[in-house]
């Protein structure tokens, strides 16, 4: 294992796990999502090019991936800085920033945000989904991909000495592509060498999380140090969810604040609202999985920032936690989900 054993690696360097506090395990602070632009509905093309204004926020909220400017979160560094200060004032301590290669990762800005706010920021190593893989990435062997992941954690990312502290979010489609499968295998190999945390973005199909865990297991990954993201939009059947939970990974509900009638990235999926997410978390707690649950918002577009009338990075702490208490979850359980579980996951073995 690496010299990071027993530590959490932030963009400002290793810290003691006890320093993290309440942690959001799946967010984006600076990124570009323009690779996933969705054409607007018929006769609404002009709306996709207008500046973000009060009068068109309703349209953007309903069509977030059809507005060009909305996909450029990396234009809002100052707004994100202000939001992180607000998050800290509300009791937040750390954010895992899941932007990887393919989403315009910017570790320099992450370091600046950490310095400016005092919030611990953990950067993500690796590659997003196949649609963002370069020809060079697709041409790499598993061994070469493994070397890239290890280097981003031990030496620095994006030509800097700023080091990542997790592998991921590793992007996967449904079904997996050959390039994504290689990246998963490399992720397992790097994790085996480093003892580091891993976080996965599954394809939008109930079978995707199962397929990914199988690939990781076969390649030697430590599933107990691995997070499966986006379960709110992936596995809906309770029996199937319990079957997946038995595999031993962390179960992440990370779309809090997202309440959509039509989910543009997968129209067949009925996106749950926060009340349903709370009930699903309570279900998992009652089934004995409180040690495996994580929560976040996965903010990746402008309209979800408070600057544009969105819920922001403090939504879970200010709004969701009180509702969870009202629904019978205890302070002890919520402390485990927001503090202890992230700490255990992020600590290098």
From Swiss-Prot:
* GO biological process: one example: taurine metabolic process
What does the UniProt record say this protein does? N-acetyltaurine hydrolase that regulates feeding by catalyzing the hydrolysis of N-acetyltaurine into taurine and acetate. N-acetyltaurine has anorexigenic and anti-obesity effects that are dependent on GFRAL receptor and GDF15. PTER also acts on other N-acetyl amino acids (Met, Ile, Leu, Val) and N-propionyltaurine, but at lower rates. Binds resiniferotoxin, a vanilloid that desensitizes nociceptive neurons.
What PANTHER family does the annotation carry? PHOSPHOTRIESTERASE-RELATED, PHOSPHOTRIESTERASE-RELATED PROTEIN
Q: Where does a divalent metal cation 1 bind?
A: 26, 28, 169, 298
Reaction catalysed by this enzyme? N-acetyltaurine + H2O = taurine + acetate; N-propanoyltaurine + H2O = propanoate + taurine; N-acetyl-L-methionine + H2O = L-methionine + acetate; N-acetyl-L-isoleucine + H2O = L-isoleucine + acetate
Please tell me in which tissues this protein is expressed: Expressed primarily in proximal tubules of the kidney.
Q: Give the Enzyme Commission number.
A: 3.1.-.-
Question: What does this protein need as cofactor?
Answer: a divalent metal cation
Residues involved in a divalent metal cation 2 binding: 169, 201, 230
Q: Name one GO molecular function term.
A: zinc ion binding
Q: Gene Ontology cellular component?
A: cytosol
Task: Family membership, please give it.
Answer: Belongs to the metallo-dependent hydrolases superfamily. Phosphotriesterase family.
Going by the entry's taxonomy, the superkingdom of the source organism is recorded as: Eukaryota
What does the UniProt keyword field contain?
A: Cytoplasm, Hydrolase, Metal-binding
How is this protein named in the record? N-acetyltaurine hydrolase
Q: Where in the cell is it found?
A: Cytoplasm, Cytosol
- Sorted alphabetically, which InterPro entries does this protein's record hold? AryldialkylPase_Zn-BS (IPR017947), Metal_Hydrolase (IPR032466), Phosphotriesterase (IPR001559)
